Amino acid sequence: MTTKCTLNRSILAVAAVLGLSGSALAAEQKPEVQRLFQSGSYEQAVEAARDGDPASTFIAAQALLKLDRSDRAVAEMTRLRASDNAAWRLIAESGEALIADDAGRAADIARRAIEADGDNPFAHYQLGLAAGKANDWGTAVEGFTRAVELKPDFAYAHYYAALAYQRQRQLPKTAQHFDAFLRLAPDAPERGAVIAILRTIK
């Protein structure tokens, strides 16, 4: 029994006290990938995510979709499907279905990803994306707000939550999430449009 073993046990004990699951601990990602994505530096985000963790690969796919490079986004999702983690494989499969404009199938698979790991914020985010594409705004709100709860620093979960709430005419919630988006992603390409919307609803 070494100091290292004692330290490992201490880390696990702290995680248990804080209520952190294995999924939450494993959800660490390259912070620069999310930062670049949220600032609109999409190609740089893709480059930074290269050979990275599943979350960074997922964000790289989202960056490529912003660039209208669905072919490369599919390639990133295919790479993600090689993950050892069942939830990530399902998130990737859902992403592929959504890129193919099969929103219903994408939503069904995203729900399976949530069943596999309900603590993965990107599973809920993917459900929100799929539900939004299907105009199922209630489910979209649920997906994005749960993603925000699990990963409060993910600006685009706030952004899409705001859009979904706007569709439901829940304007205070819309403003709340748009404000969070602007705070987390001050350089995002959507900044001007978001400020304009906020002026009309506040």
Regions found by a protein language model. Name each.
Residues 59, 92-93, 126, 160, ...:
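Canonical tetratricopeptide repeat
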Residues 13-21:
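Bacterial N-terminal signal peptides
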Residues 44, 67-76, 99-112, 134-146, ...:
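Structural signature of tandem alpha-helical TPR/SEL1-like repeats
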Residues 24-59, 66-68:
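N-terminal leader/linker segments that initiate helical-solenoid repeat arrays
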Residues 2-12:
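Bacterial N-terminal signal peptides that target proteins for export
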